[in-house]
Amino acid sequence: MRVGTSSNSLMWILRASWVALLLASPWHVAAHHSTPVNVVLIVGGWAMGASGLLSSIALTPIGLTVVRLVTVPMVALVTSQVSYGITENNATVAMTLALVAIACAAALACTTRVSTAMVQAGAYGDETRYPLRTPFPYVLPAALVQLGYTAAIISGPLLLAARSYAAGVAVTLIAVAASFKVPRRLHQLSRRWLVVVPAGLVVHDHLVLAETFMVRHANLTDVRTADGPGEEADLTGGVFGRRLVVSLTAADKVVLAPITRQVLGTTDALHVSSFSTAPRQLDAAMARLKK
């Protein structure tokens, strides 16, 4: 599937937002502390801004995770320096540009079209990927984890630069330890999609499933939408509202992830004759499956 014109336009706006942020360089405005703190702010600002821009150019699912990871600390950096940049440093234009740019980048990073464009860019051959909605039970924990990780990543080096060595070392060690797990865990949210291929469909969701679940076209009897959970196996992970319900000619085996088994109180594998999943572009996915 080719990325649509509207998605391409949004991607260009996202790239332009990162370019504008780099041009505004609000981390230079923020650098009004001691020299070590200034160095941390400037190096960190350029590194995060460049990462956001490069990830929006080289479209990949990993890039989607990177954009989401760097957007949060950039929002914190820009908003925390608005007052000083405008009143003390007389940098009204730069700070206004930075605010608008990071607001656009943050908003676009959350949109379905940007997510789809970045996920689809990594597709193989004649396959169409539809990102899945984030299960409700994971939304708040994921947000809290990202906020905590962001706070540790930012405050650790700044505390060290400000010579608060005890607190700085402790927070930096926490940030380093978290870096081995948090990005990988958050990346799972970017690697959840329904794939439509000529041979059938694939549910690629290692947050909910232990193994990728593939259904061949010959085993598909019906595809429909539903407003909520029904008698079918719920493979959405706990999404509210509309979902795609797929009915099979013969029951097929689906292997659940450990956390899904605990939530459902069932065995590690189920034989399902119908199941539901929740792609963000629900109607588009159904139309593609019915072709």
Language-model region placement:
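Hydrophobic core segments of alpha-helical transmembrane domains in multi-pass membrane proteins
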Residues: 41-48, 94-103, 168-177
